[in-house]
Regions:
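Short glycine/serine/threonine-rich phosphate/pyrophosphate-binding segments
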Residues: 1-2, 25-28, 48-57, 76-79, ...
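Glycine/charged-rich beta-loop-alpha catalytic/anionic-binding loops adjacent to active sites
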Residues: 13-16, 40, 64, 86-94
């Protein structure tokens, strides 16, 4: 979740961050999800482990996009979380990123918001260009020194 927050901060996107359990505090969860739209929330990023019902329940109650982050678990390495989040019934979609994929969740949220925000879209384009430049620099270094010396 920290990686998602770092990305949102990088793009200047305001957000709420809470620790809420759909199982251990259902009343608080229902109130949060049902009032998110009136608070101005446009996208929910929900991380969950094990049974991982939080993102799906958010999607059932919140009328706008929900991004689920399956969290790594000790018993099954996060696969339980991944399957729980990705296997949603028809009509209740949850966009799902990789296990512990907070950074991509933040980027996906930014891209969703950028549909109606040209300034944010420009920042995302700059971010993509920065990533491309980073790869080009790594390739130039590889071409210059060869693979034997690349990581030394």
């Amino acid at each position: 979740m920290a990686k998602a927050a770092e990305i949102l901060d990088k793009f200047g996107i305001s957000y709420e961050m809470r620790i809420i359990s759909a199982h251990r505090m259902p009343d608080t969860f229902f109130e949060y999800a049902q009032t998110a739209e009136e608070r101005g929330v446009k996208v929910i990023i929900a991380g969950a482990g094990m049974a991982a019902h939080l993102p799906g329940m958010c999607a059932a109650l919140f009328p706008m996009p929900v991004i689920g982050i399956p969290m790594h678990t000790t018993s099954l390495g996060g696969r339980d979380s991944l399957y729980s989040i990705v296997q949603m019934p028809s009509g209740i979609p949850v966009a799902t990123v990789a296990i512990n994929g907070g950074a991509n969740a933040g980027i996906l949220a930014a891209k969703i918001l950028a549909v109606s925000d040209p300034e944010l879209l420009a920042k995302l384009k700059d971010y993509s260009a920065e990533m491309k430049d980073g790869v080009l620099k790594k390739d130039a270094k590889l071409q210059e020194c060869g693979y034997h010396n690349y990581t030394k």
